[in-house]
Amino acid sequence: MTRSGGARTRPGVLVVLVALLAAVSACSVTPPPPLVPSTPGMTVVPKEKLNEVVVGVDDVKGSYNPHTMAGQSTVTTALASLLLPSTFRADADGSPRVDLDLLVGAEVTKAEPYTVTYTIRRDASWSDGAPIAAEDFVYLWERMRAEPGVVDPAGYRLVSDITSREGGKVVEVVFRHPYPGWRSLFTNLLPAHLLKDAPGGWAAALTDSFPATAGPFAVRTLDQPRGEIILERNDRFWEQPAALDRVVLRRASQSATLDALKTGDDQAALVRADEKSLKGIDDLARTTPLTTAVVPRAEVVQVLARPAAPQMTDVRVRQAVLNALDRDELIAAGTRKGPAAELRADAQVVPPTKAGYQPTFQPNPTPVAQLLTEAGYTPQNGGWARDGKQLSLTIAAPDGVEPYVTVAHQVQRQLSLSGIAGRVLTTPPNQLFGRDLSGTATTDVEVVDIAVVPRVDTGDSAAALASAFGCRASLGDVSTPIPANLSGFCDQSVQTTIEDALTGNVLLSDALARVEPVLWQQAVAMPLFQVADLLVVLPQAQNVTAGAPFAGPLSGASTWRREGR
């Protein structure tokens, strides 16, 4: 019988419970079994190995527009070669070859008016699905002929019209004059459908990102603060897919990059090496198998004495300024005894590593004091003055861009030794090239007397000559003023020769033989050296080479492989 509110407990059950508790207490002092029991034949699966190549670089900052002077950098060249489509690319010997990834073909189809017809592949498209078409050609043409601070615009300014058919896949480009260098045009096409109406316009194009791409790789991460860019295989690319899953560009100091090569965290490096880092690489090579190659860029460091500046209109003042400079010392300061020290630039137009380069340097032996005196200046308080005003020059360089800032400070120091006062002005690159040096500003801008800036040759040296030293172009169908060259130089005595070289009426070599002596005498530019990077490659990164001239190593990244991956 059960009482209300309780239950009767049997004595036997209590005995069993006590026994169980004793057993549990006894077990609690025994060490716990191992978390992973040792089982014969069991293997631990390693962490997945990424099929990638990590490349150490000096910097990853933008802008990334390869068509602007402000965008010229190692990383811009690398990204453009992998992400943007081009009508032609450089072959191993530097000659242009049609890029069959983009085009079916391209040829001159009419002599009068001079017309080039491009046939675009039907399957060529941007990463957002939009077709690559005539509007991309039109957008680049319109911007290159009219915007300030662009690279080698002279060829684009010969184009008078662009028409299309077959849904924009057949593009006809009409020129005002014959243009033998037409193959240098329409490289690194940009997505017009995304950029033409974008906020900020051309000045903001590719400042810190790529809105769409059309190459073997696409951008996964572009993190400037962290100093890392991750490119991944573009699954939308219509041609042979890249062998790697990813290419990583990683910013570090050169000592940190050497450490990363030593540990294998980086499999390659592309850096503007100096004497110290060259020694570090030599030391590393004693214990680590590696290969190295010098990679010259399409960029020559130059000092411009700008006739556009009121204080520099007199050729004798420009001659005095350049004569006050020690070229050897400037080259040593800019190259820091790295690979570029062997690429001294003694010609005004063609860079040292390009076919057709011939040294033409003509030093002016006239003393600085004599030239300034002839220009009307007199010594005063350790300096030079004319009409009661001291000669004091502004020396500009793109802010944060080496070796230009270093060279600019050396220019200031050397001028001071001759009593010529100066100050260094470092300006954001977009502002320096797009406003201060273009001659198109509608508001007051800083007057730049001397500019330490690059001279860039994108493939057609005749266009480089016309762009750097030709007189300001005049296009009747453009309402805004066409930018002048960076120095503001114009000499009618050589202008016809410059135009004839551009249109093929005279050989470039003959034109340079006439023009370069005038350029040296006019003291407009003092070229110093060609910029060069150093490529370092470990055996883990396969098929990595210096690449075609001026294309850069990453132009071949679609064929790179990672050992054992």
At which residue positions do the language-model features occur?
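Ligand/substrate-recognition segments at binding pockets and active sites
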Residues: 224, 378-454
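Extracellular/periplasmic solute-recognition and catalytic clefts
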Residues: 220-230, 248-313, 319-320, 332
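Surface-exposed binding/hinge segments that line
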Residues: 119, 153-199
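Gly/Pro-rich hinge or "lid" segments in bacterial periplasmic/extracellular proteins
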Residues: 93, 187-242, 246
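Detector for C-terminal structural segments
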Residues: 29, 34-39, 325-356, 369, ...
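Alpha-helical secondary-structure segments
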Residues: 54, 133-140, 170-174, 216, ...
